[in-house]
Amino acid sequence: VVIDRISGNALQKQGIDPAAMDARREINGFTRSEAAVVSPRNSEHVEDNFNDAVYSGARFGLSYIINEDWDVLVQHTQQTLDTEGVFAYDPTVEGESSAIRFQSDENSDEFGLTTWTLNGRLEKLDVVYTGGYLDREIDTLTDYTGYTNGGLFSAYYVCTHYETPDNPDDARCLDPSKYYKEDTTSTRLTHELRFSTTMDTPWQLTAGVFYDEQEVGSVGQFKIASPEIFENLASSWNALAGDRGINSDGGPFSPEISFVNDVTHTIEQIAVFGQLGYEITDTLTATIGARWYQIDDIYRGATSTRDVTSRLEAYGQGVLDPAVYDGLGLDGQGVVDAIQDGSLEIGLLDGDGVLTVDDTIFKFGLDWKVNENVLLFANYSEGFRPPVTNRLGGDAAANDTGAFADFRVPVYSTTDTLDNYEIGLKGDFLDGILRVNATGYYSEISDLQTSRFDPANISFLVFTDNVGDAEVKGIDADITWLATDNLVINAAFSVLDTELVSINPELEGIAAGVGSELPYSADFSGNISARYFFELDGGKEGYVNASLTYTGDRLAGMVMNAYAMEDATRLIYGTGSGLKIKDEGDEFKGATYPGADGETIRGGRYIQESYVIGNVSVGMTYQNWKVEAFVDNVFDKSAILNIDTQQYTPKVVTNRPRTIGLRFSYDYY
């Protein structure tokens, strides 16, 4: 039933009754060869404590004092992380530590990071040059069976209804097990050169230049279609549509691979920055800063159905010949019409298909030293996130009805910008035993970026879009109290009020509406810790440390698809997830079908409920060594860190269980 409705009633259109097929499932007593619905098997993957992680690595640093004015520091970190399993549980299974998987999940992550810093003086100038180089490789194999519950073409990939149009009773839906395999390599090189004045004058100047180049190359292989129906896809489906910018040999790939995504994403940034501070009086200082930047977002490569490089070049060259876009796998006339009416933006691309943006952002500040112990400040600053090119920009929605009529994947998301206003204080009080840092702020976010994944209606690949505008109001504070000579208490808290103030019309009824809270933002969060020191015999010092951390309720994601997830979960597992939902709309327009009860599916988002985590430790130090026993998550609380809905049934990412351990360190120098 789930496969049929998510596929636009593909089975019913062939005269097949999905409910009758479900009744003839393998688990209902039919053999695997005669069952109308063949269930996936995962008994070979069942085990306790299946999510293993093994870390190994090394770090070293070398510092050299060249002379009294110059010194250099070089550091290198090498690390490998190998994991098996997943770190999210299925809420439909009893307890909070079990996951349902039909494919082994494996991940290997290896990186080397080298950084360098040169400090020096040139007359009245302090000079800092710093840089870094990262080389990283990630190999991933993950269960992709969840696509069956949310992919528009699920019925086509696993059911035989197209082969039995004259005999509906012979139709079968075969084992839907799927996987996704990705090999990713990434490099990043950064340089920054900064000068600061040290003259005894009322003004101070800092200026510099920054360069950043990062490249990510990935080859992703999707096993989606049933190999019993599609016996050899190497010659028909999975060959790449282009060869420029790819990281593989172009195929053919394994015969069970349905689609391949082979792309190279390069981002180059150069920036020039400066800040001028001026002491208006002995107690009042004003600052002004500016940063000019230029970013090139370069996307190259191909998928099994799209030549990404050629498509972006055509957009950048302003091609308006429908035949060109027809040859690139698009509906040519529709694309040209969208470009001409402005609904498909391409103006930021150059003739090579490179997305280039540049701008200048500013900041202003005013500091007032009320006395030797108290500083008040007010700041205004601007920020941004650069635009992102989409590999399938221009594609029409796979489901061209309802809220998705005339929708096209944007060629790129535009820059989202931040205007931030803040006031605050930093001060020592009560003769220095109480220190308070507090900030109140108001932020305006324009053209807020969000990632979208909607295989039921648009595309089975993630893309970025702009959801609308938002406002954030908040207060942050941290407090340190020297309660006694031996007891130090630290506390911090954050209060947030977030609101979506406008929304992209294409997302109305899909994303949360105007006035809604932003996701992942707790109204209140805070922590408090206490550390008590005591003397021991022989010059040793002991300590006891305890802390509590509270995080309030947060909403999961921008899309209000929780009720749709619950409806699918009940049909698949026979029970709901038990997760809380905030009701936010009479209709979720991302579901183009009624619920199992025949009613319209409402809009809502999952609530990631509040939690408290406690940690304790006791330790001892003596000269160069330190030993500590600790208990993290002392109450063994299973917290909801994130609720993932991309598998069309919710999965809950949780924290580590109670962990007891011993640490030992020795400083030798």
Predicted features along the sequence, with ranges:
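Transmembrane beta-strands of outer-membrane beta-barrel pores
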Residues: 76-82, 122, 133-137, 211-215, ...
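Repeated loop/turn-to-beta-strand initiation elements of outer-membrane beta-barrel proteins
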Residues: 69-72, 124-127, 202-205, 283-286, ...
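C-terminal beta-barrel architecture of Gram-negative outer-membrane proteins
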Residues: 521-621, 635
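Transmembrane beta-barrel wall of Gram-negative outer-membrane proteins
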Residues: 1-83, 112-113, 186-191, 199-212, ...
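Structural signature of Gram-negative outer-membrane beta-barrels, strongest in the C-terminal barrel
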Residues: 63-67, 195-198, 208-212, 263-444
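C-terminal beta-signal and adjacent terminal beta-strands/loops
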Residues: 222-223, 229, 549-569, 575, ...
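Membrane-embedded beta-barrel scaffold of Gram-negative outer-membrane proteins
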Residues: 117-144, 369-385, 391-394, 412-475, ...
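Gram-negative outer-membrane beta-barrel transporters
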Residues: 282-286, 435-444, 463-560, 663-669
